[in-house]
């Protein structure tokens, strides 16, 4: 029997309910406002009172209204049919909702329970299985979707029967398993899992050792993101966070992409809805939307559901990781999620931390980021969840609590600089403030030595030194004037400008330059480094700037040319001739 309660107090979207039985922290309940049934979550229990956070507007709610407790936490539905769907933060399918605006209390099925799937068994009668073991597979879009023993089942089981290959609904029984006491369990293709708990059906979680290719030079070459790693992109408004995330989601070397639009403007999400069904994935030749799930909680949707949306996205990511797939989860922006936590904490009158954020903000963010990672499954296969979040610090202040807390948890830091954005140097990733701690991992160094070239990390650090020395030279030139410093200072500055213009800047709206494969990045980077290592016979700063501007122009044309085309090779030859003319004899 369900536990019931009555509304005893209302503080904006927090409702205090008087309860007639036991309720648990994070339990889901429904608050009734007339005929409307609104989902809510228990966030605090004190004696016979439960503080519940309502995922909708509480307008019209009054003292004495009914509250019904469900006895379980907020759960995600995991089954074939998730790919290419658009959800809200509570996994309601947005396509099934009617009307221009989302009505209060709207709840829709996350998947089509009547759809049929071509099932192919992988397990046999008599096999010993445990939670997360693969029983069979169905083809979802072009991904082989594994049907697994529900994660909630503990201990070992024996397969008593499994259906033959054929067409089935997700709700049909596809296998029967027995436990050690001979109790039978009917298994279907659908299972549920609480979003706030990590799925831990794996044997080990090794450190990331492979690099995830994104096609963005400033990331892949300078600060690589590891497969199963974590990164975040802080930056002020208008610095290009969303465009950079969209570029990565289009080009990343991943099997499944999950985009969580958490409190962002609705028009940015509409862009994804409009673009992704049209775009083709160059790796597979399929539409990008076929490997993408969008969880959309825009800024005009209930604030409380923002927190749920990031957890729902991560849970779906962990589900696909358990199939041995590479998953990329992107949240834009985690600052809005932190603001939802702050609002909740303030309404509960908890002790505030810095900037009124909750005291445990750092622990909450670290706990969430730790759910990403590379895992070794029970059957020996590997899967990964790579997480990339954006942070929108107020006024571009990178010392505020959300950025500081995220910095402790994430291994890659891609700081977007307002000055680079203002001077149209996109992507505006600051080459000196940004870092990737994966460059320090021996496993990643080995991988880069093997897959790109020997001593690649040393070459990356050399490039960073060139940029640093160029900045110092520029400061001197600005103070003393063009004539007040030796030509070597100008040369040093222009070498850093060359590296910046050719490697760090990229056109996300050009069909060729938007996606730069690793092989091409290696060739271009080595070419630029080779030029930067040489000394040139330049009489004065005017000749120096003319020479390097010409080089930058030719390299830019190369970036816009098809890889290894006649045009590309032509520009390469022109660069070599120009450099040979000016080399110091």
Which residues are covered by each model-predicted region?
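N-terminal accessory targeting/assembly segments
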Residues: 1-103
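Short beta-strands and strand-coil junctions in structured, solvent-facing domains, enriched
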Residues: 15-16, 38-39, 50, 60-61, ...
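Conserved "cap/hinge" positions at secondary-structure junctions
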Residues: 19, 33, 70-71, 90, ...
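Short, compositionally biased
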Residues: 43-49, 80-91, 142-166, 184-199
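P-loop NTPase nucleotide-binding/switch module
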Residues: 99-133, 137-142, 146-152, 169-229, ...
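C-terminal amphipathic alpha-helical interaction region
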Residues: 539-585
């Amino acid at each position: 029997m369900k536990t019931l309660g009555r509304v005893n107090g209302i503080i904006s979207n927090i409702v205090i309910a008087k309860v007639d039985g036991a309720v648990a922290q994070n339990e889901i309940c429904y608050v009734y406002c007339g005929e409307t049934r609104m989902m809510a979550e228990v966030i605090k229990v004190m004696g016979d009172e439960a503080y519940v956070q309502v995922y909708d507007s509480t307008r019209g709610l009054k003292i004495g209204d009914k509250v019904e407790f469900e006895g379980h936490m907020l759960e995600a539905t995991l089954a074939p049919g998730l790919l290419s769907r658009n959800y809200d933060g509570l996994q309601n399918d947005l396509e099934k909702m009617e009307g221009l605006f989302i009505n209060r209390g709207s709840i829709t099925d996350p998947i089509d329970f009547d759809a049929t799937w071509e099932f192919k068994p992988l397990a046999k009668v008599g096999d010993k299985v445990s939670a997360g073991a693969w029983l069979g597979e169905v083809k979802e879009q072009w991904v082989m979707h594994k049907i697994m023993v529900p994660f909630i089942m503990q201990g070992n089981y024996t397969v008593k029967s499994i259906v033959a290959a054929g067409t089935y609904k997700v709700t049909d029984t596809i296998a029967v398993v027995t436990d050690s006491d001979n109790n039978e369990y009917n298994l279907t293709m659908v299972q549920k899992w609480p979003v706030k708990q990590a799925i831990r059906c794996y044997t080990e979680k090794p450190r990331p050792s492979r690099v995830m290719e994104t096609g963005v030079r400033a990331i892949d070459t300078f600060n690589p993101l590891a497969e199963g790693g974590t990164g975040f992109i802080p930056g002020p408004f208008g610095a290009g966070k969303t465009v950079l995330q969209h570029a990565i989601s289009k080009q990343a070397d991943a099997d499944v992409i999950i985009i969580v639009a958490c409190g962002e403007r609705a028009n940015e999400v509409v862009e994804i809805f409009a673009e992704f069904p049209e775009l083709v994935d160059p790796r597979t030749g399929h539409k990008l939307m076929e490997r993408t799930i969008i969880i959309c909680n825009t800024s005009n949707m209930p604030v409380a559901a923002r927190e749920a949306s990031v957890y729902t996205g991560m849970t779906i990511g962990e589900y696909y990781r358990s199939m041995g797939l590479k998953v990329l989860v992107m949240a834009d922006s985690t600052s809005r999620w932190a603001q939802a936590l702050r609002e909740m904490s303030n309404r509960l009158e908890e002790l505030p931390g810095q900037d009124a954020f909750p005291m445990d903000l750092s622990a909450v963010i670290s706990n969430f980021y730790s759910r990403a990672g590379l895992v070794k499954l029970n059957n020996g296969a590997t899967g990964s969840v790579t997480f990339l979040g954006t942070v929108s610090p107020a006024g571009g202040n990178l010392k505020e609590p959300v950025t500081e807390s995220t910095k402790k948890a994430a291994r890659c830091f891609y700081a977007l600089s307002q000055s680079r954005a203002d001077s149209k140097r996109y992507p505006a990733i600051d080459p000196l403030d940004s870092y990737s701690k994966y460059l320090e991992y021996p496993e990643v160094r080995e991988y880069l030595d093997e897959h790109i070239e020997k001593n690649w990390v040393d070459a990356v650090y050399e490039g960073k030194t060139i940029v640093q020395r160029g900045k110092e030279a520029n400061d001197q030139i600005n103070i003393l004037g063009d004539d007040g410093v030796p030509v070597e200072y100008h040369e040093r500055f222009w070498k850093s400008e060359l590296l910046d213009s050719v490697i760090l800047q990229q056109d996300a709206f050009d069909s060729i330059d938007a996606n730069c494969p690793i092989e091409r990045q290696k060739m271009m980077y080595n070419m630029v480094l080779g030029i930067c290592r040489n000394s040139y016979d330049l009489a004065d700063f005017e000749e120096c700037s003319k020479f390097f501007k010409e080089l930058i122009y030719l390299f830019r044309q190369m970036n816009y040319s098809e890889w290894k085309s006649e045009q590309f090779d032509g520009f390469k030859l022109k660069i070599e001739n120009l450099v040979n003319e000016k080399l110091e004899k």
